[in-house]
Curated annotation (Swiss-Prot):
Source organism of this protein record: Helicobacter pylori (strain HPAG1)
GO biological process: regulation of translational fidelity; translation
Entry-linked InterPro entries: Asp/Glu-ADT_sf_sub_c, GatC
Keyword Cytoplasm attributed: no
HAMAP family in alphabetical order: GatC
Protein's UniProt name: Aspartyl/glutamyl-tRNA(Asn/Gln) amidotransferase subunit C
Enzyme kind, highest EC tier: ligase
Keywords: ATP-binding, Ligase, Nucleotide-binding, Protein biosynthesis
Reaction catalysed by this enzyme: L-glutamyl-tRNA(Gln) + L-glutamine + ATP + H2O = L-glutaminyl-tRNA(Gln) + L-glutamate + ADP + phosphate + H(+); L-aspartyl-tRNA(Asn) + L-glutamine + ATP + H2O = L-asparaginyl-tRNA(Asn) + L-glutamate + ADP + phosphate + 2 H(+)
Self-association state and partner proteins as the record states: Heterotrimer of A, B and C subunits.
Family: Belongs to the GatC family.
Length: 93
């Protein structure tokens, strides 16, 4: 694909960007380079590659653990707690 002034102007309009005249040739070169990379990717032969779409994530067994004193230990570290909650200064009036 050839990057010409008409295509660059269309891309400017679609992206709502303005490319200064002194940068247009540089941008055209960069876009041509990017399109070259994309064409190389499309040219790759991928039909022999194995897809990994059927992989599943191994899950661990859920093992509930009873830790009744954890909340009490955490709240005991704070000076201000009430009814099993932290008490913090009011910030919204």
């Amino acid at each position: 694909m050839q990057i010409d002034d008409a295509l660059l102007q269309r891309l400017e309009k679609l992206s709502m960007l303005e490319i200064k005249d002194e940068h247009k040739e540089s941008v055209k070169g960069h876009l041509a380079e990017i399109l070259g990379f994309v064409e190389n990717i499309f040219a790759l032969e991928t039909s022999a590659l194995k897809t990994d779409t059927e992989l599943c994530t191994p899950l661990r067994e859920d093992e509930p653990k009873s830790q009744p004193n954890t909340a009490k230990e955490i709240l005991s570290q704070n000076k201000h707690s009430q009814d099993h909650y932290f008490v913090v200064p009011k910030i919204i009036e």
